């Protein structure tokens, strides 16, 4: 179980989160997006309560639904929205993802890949990050400003960096970002959630 009160692998970002924790706990969706740097946004997300996380993902998917899709694609995106709305404990860090939800997420990705012919980048952009898609169904690459693991062990003695990705999935998926595809199990402190699909799964590796 993740107990240590750290929020990022980046020492400076971690300190920012700790210093602004009260504000983060009251942060609305629009404020999260206004941070405009995914590493800082991820740190804020780690500090969020389950309702803040739920509202963020619902907002992202509802905005995604407004883009230009076929009816079949709209229906498929809506399935993720229903999944979130129907699971009150989905984003509770104390509750593991149940087998039914796990299977539903897996089947959602496979249908998107095999039936809708979505590529891995689009699937990543929808289900593996709460970042918004632009009109071209792409992520805003300018948000990747800050190194995810910079200074993660400086001046920390024997303290391990926080794990920041889930390494259990096939290598075919984008695991860390559109640029860092590999997640390797290494010397890092495992967190029970905040990685993988809908950021619901264990963080057990480091992006490389």
Locate predicted features.
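Secreted, short cysteine-rich peptides and small extracellular cysteine-rich domains stabilized by multiple disulfide
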Residues: 160-208
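Mature extracellular/secreted ectodomains of secretory-pathway proteins
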Residues: 10-158
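Short, small-residue-biased leader/transition segments that mark boundaries at the very start
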Residues: 1-2
């Amino acid at each position: 179980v993740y107990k240590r009160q750290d929020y990022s692998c980046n020492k400076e970002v971690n300190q920012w989160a700790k210093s602004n924790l009260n504000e983060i706990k009251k942060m609305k969706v629009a404020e999260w997006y206004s941070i405009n740097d995914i590493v800082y946004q991820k740190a804020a997300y780690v500090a969020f309560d389950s309702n803040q996380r739920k509202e963020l993902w619902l907002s992202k998917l509802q905005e995604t639904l407004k883009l230009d899709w076929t009816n079949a694609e709209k229906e498929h995106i809506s399935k993720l929205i229903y999944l979130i709305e129907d699971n009150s404990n989905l984003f509770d860090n104390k509750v593991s993802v149940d087998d039914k939800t796990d299977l539903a997420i897996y089947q959602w990705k496979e249908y998107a890949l095999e039936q809708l012919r979505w590529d891995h980048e689009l699937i990543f952009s929808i289900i593996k990050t709460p970042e918004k898609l632009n009109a071209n169904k792409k992520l805003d690459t300018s948000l990747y400003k800050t190194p995810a693991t910079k200074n993660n062990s400086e001046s920390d003695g024997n303290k391990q960096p926080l794990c920041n990705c889930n390494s259990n999935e096939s290598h075919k998926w984008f695991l860390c970002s559109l640029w860092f595809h590999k997640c390797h199990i290494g010397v890092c402190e495992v967190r029970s959630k905040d990685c993988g699909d809908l950021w619901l799964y264990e963080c057990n590796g480091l992006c490389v």
